[in-house]
Amino acid sequence: MDPEDRSEIAFFDVETTVPKRGQRFAILEFGSILVCPKKLTELRSYTTLVQPADLSLISSLSVRCNGIKRDDVVLAPLFADIADTVYDILHGRIWAGHNILRFDCARIREAFAEIGRQPPEPKGAIDSLGLLTQKFGRRAGDMKMATLARYFGLGNQTHRSLDDVRMNLEVLKYCATVLFLESSLPYAHVDNSVSPETISSRRRIDASREGNTVTTSVRLPSISENSAAQPDPFNMSVLRNEMASDNHIQSDILMEEEQIEPSDVVASENTSDHEGFLTPDAMSLSNIKAMLFPFYPGSQMMKLKLLHGDSPLQLYCSYLKIRFGVNGKFLDNTGRRRLNFVVDLNPSLYSILEACDSNAQKLSVDSGSTSEWNPVVNPMKGFVNYPNARIHIATEINGDEARYATEIHQRESSGATQKLIFSNPNNEELESLLTTGSVVDAFLSLEPYDYQQKAGIRLVAKKLVIQS
């Protein structure tokens, strides 16, 4: 192969820190393989750890995501030291990777900008996330690399750059083979909606299902300087139209107005009945997982949910001390009061929320989101020297009227509990009850959101028991 034609496909992946609010990504590892476009064989590989300019960016959350610790990179080269090699590998070649258009390409451009150099430019791009979503569909469940690899029995994803790009190539080979066979055997198709738990099942679907042919001539679009913020180059119009028309998505600013989904488990008025809710001490960190589910049956739009085992992750937290109470001076865009308060977290609850945050953020990034992640646990700063989190009181809108969707009870010193009835959420009744220093028992739902480039988990109270 002529070394000057640069016809090889450059599969690449970067491992990065997981930034907190206001921080930037920092590359911790770069890995790439050059692949022959005619034989799909690996011709050359390169990988290296990268020392970030600021080692403090490597947080415990970052280590949980990719296993790269500060000690691993303290003697590694800076990005400036490997920039020539990275440029030579990438410039003028077709780039390939999983979610590279929204993530890896942006990180490469940022890294070159930080050292004052022009970034490499591709002559085309293959983003396997967009390509496989369109061509292969969600028959494996979600479109995470780890899920696709498990579907084909390729082992576990290590979240290390060179391993991931090699796995990416193998996944593409397997998917292409399946699509080729389907196009050749139109009467023997597999179900396109099989979940990871049932991928061993063999099902038949209507032979007239669309999307079973392989396009053998796909023009690879070049990427402009701002490509990281542009749509995927593949035809995702159906998904985009669905996003535009979907009425389930609500603004994070208007989170208090969201409707309670019928499937949500709500605690009964008997405070001894905690069915569906677990205390933090009763939960196992290894059983916490984040998964993608359709917004509604048949939808291509996916929403992220948190599970404990196979059940929705819902918490019962007793004796939470309120650090900052409800403050009526903060309003949402409709003029209604924002109903939330901040509580201190005990160590077990803190660990659970950190694990939820880590799992949800990783899935959010892996599924293609570029939104800024808002941690569920508020950072400790200034005089606030204890981990804390914000709890939201849900409201329901019925015409022009609003009412609390959160059940609110009050426990007297005698132990008797009564349900409180409020006229509407626009008055100041809660301000006198949920004050700084008071104590509540809370039944909490953890609800991930991703809207207007903001993503995170909000703690929504299904039921509150205020201690007198």
Curated annotation (Swiss-Prot):
Annotated compartments: Cytoplasm; Nucleus
Gene3D superfamilies for the chain: Ribonuclease H-like superfamily/Ribonuclease H
InterPro entries: Exonuclease_RNaseT/DNA_pol3, RNaseH-like_sf, RNaseH_sf
Induction of the gene: Regulated by the transcription factors NAC045 and NAC086.
Class in the EC hierarchy, top level: hydrolase
Tissue specificity annotation: Expressed in the sieve elements and phloem pole pericycle cells.
Top-rank taxon, per record: Eukaryota
Bridged cysteine pairs (disulfide): none
Binding residues annotated for Mg(2+) 2, in chain numbering: 13
Keywords: Cytoplasm, Exonuclease, Hydrolase, Magnesium, Metal-binding, Nuclease, Nucleus
Annotated active site: 159
GO molecular function, one term: metal ion binding
Function statement: Probable exonuclease involved in enuclation of sieve elements.
Protein name stated in the entry: Protein NEN1
Gene assigned in the entry: NEN1
